[in-house]
Amino acid sequence: MRAIELIFENLPAAVNEKNQDAIDKMGLAQYIAGMGFSNVGLGIVHSMAHQLGAVYDTPHGLANAILLPTVMRFNGQDPATAQRFREILCEIGRPDAAHLNDQDVINTFVWMISELSKSVGITQTIKDVGAKEEDFGMLADKAMEDPCKPGNPREVSREDFIELYRQAM
């Protein structure tokens, strides 16, 4: 949770203003997040991002940032994940999330992530990094075999991956 707070509080200043304190806090956020995913694993946002890196030479962090809103919408359909999103929103300054329905929680969190990405100049679609719809089947096949896939909170099929890539266009 602390890593998410630090990212929301410091990413724009670190990127746009080159504020050294914000840069240092982003380093701390990276460290904390790394400890977290070392313990619980990753999910399909990484499975999908690995394929964009391999096929289109997209930097991993950029691919994750572009894909995250789409994958959050997908994973948020799991009630336990929607509840976790609600808890995160309440912790990062949106206490009203406690009273929102699951779909509004998902929409709010996805919007916040998208706005944060836009605020630091991150492109919003995989088309912008060269992705082609005719490659989605191949990308999905590779994502199905990715070692991060089992860490996802929802089961995902090849068809789901294709649709998620399509939504990220």
Language-model features, listed with the residues they occupy:
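Carboxylate- and glycine-rich phosphate/diphosphate-binding segment that chelates Mg2+/Mn2+
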Residues: 1-40
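Residues on a specific face of well-ordered alpha-helices
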Residues: 2-5, 9, 50, 66-70
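Short alpha-helical scaffolding segments that buttress acidic/His motifs in well-ordered protein cores
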Residues: 3-4, 26-34, 68, 113, ...
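A general structural signal for well-ordered alpha-helical segments in protein cores
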Residues: 4, 45, 64-65, 85, ...
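Short, structured helix-loop boundary elements
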Residues: 23, 103-106, 158
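Glycine-rich phosphate/pyrophosphate-binding beta-alpha loops
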Residues: 31-64, 146-151
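Gly/Pro-rich interdomain helix-loop hinge
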Residues: 55-135
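Short, amphipathic C-terminal "tail helix"
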Residues: 132-169
